[in-house]
Amino acid sequence: MDNKELQKLTEDISETYFKKPFRHQALFNDRLKTTGGRYLLTSHNIELNRKYLIEHGREELIGIIKHELCHYHLHLEGKGYKHRDRDFRMLLQQVNAPRFCTPLKKKAENKKTYMYICTTCGQQYIKKRAMNPDRYRCGKCRGKIKRIFS
């Protein structure tokens, strides 16, 4: 699905469920990582996360579009468009839109660790960030620290 198809789908959903036209842009933003979509208050555009379409399918994307259209239409009408507002929650129920989207599967990231050892007492230090061992001393005996592996 490309941005043109997404625009058409968003316009159709707006007419079908809200009985109001969608006059702005709906597009995919591949920089979104943890959110399904967002409604931009200044431009009134809707940005959606393509990963939800790939991972969860068209139905999940339609739910996200309905959720963002709730923000869109309420904001343009001057009503409460935030998640905590009663108007927003009522409109979500009317159009059967999800309040939250299904979380994406997390990638198994191989976190790099750095191991340091004290040359005097043998105390080991495992760190997530690299450090310059010349600038630090052992907290146990004040001996010098040496990097073992990264």
From Swiss-Prot:
In what residue span(s) does the SprT-like domain sit?
6-147
- Report residues binding Zn(2+): 67, 71
Q: Which GO terms describe its molecular function?
A: zinc ion binding
Q: Where in the cell is it found?
A: Cytoplasm
How does the cofactor attach, per the note? Binds 1 zinc ion.
Active site annotation, chain numbering? 68
Superkingdom to which the source organism belongs: Bacteria
What's the chief localization of this chain?
Answer: cytoplasm
In the record, what lineage is assigned to the organism producing the protein? Bacteria, Bacillati, Bacillota, Bacilli, Bacillales
GO terms in the biological process aspect are: response to stress
Gene giving rise to this polypeptide = ydcK
Full protein name: Protein SprT-like
What family does the Swiss-Prot or TrEMBL record give for this protein?
Belongs to the SprT family.
Kindly list the GO CC terms recorded for this protein. Answer: cytoplasm
Name the keywords, alphabetized. Cytoplasm, Metal-binding, Zinc
Keyword Iron listed:
no
Q: Pfam families attached here?
A: SprT-like (PF10263), Zn_ribbon_SprT (PF17283)
The record ties this protein, via NCBIfam families, to: PRK04351.1 (NF003339)
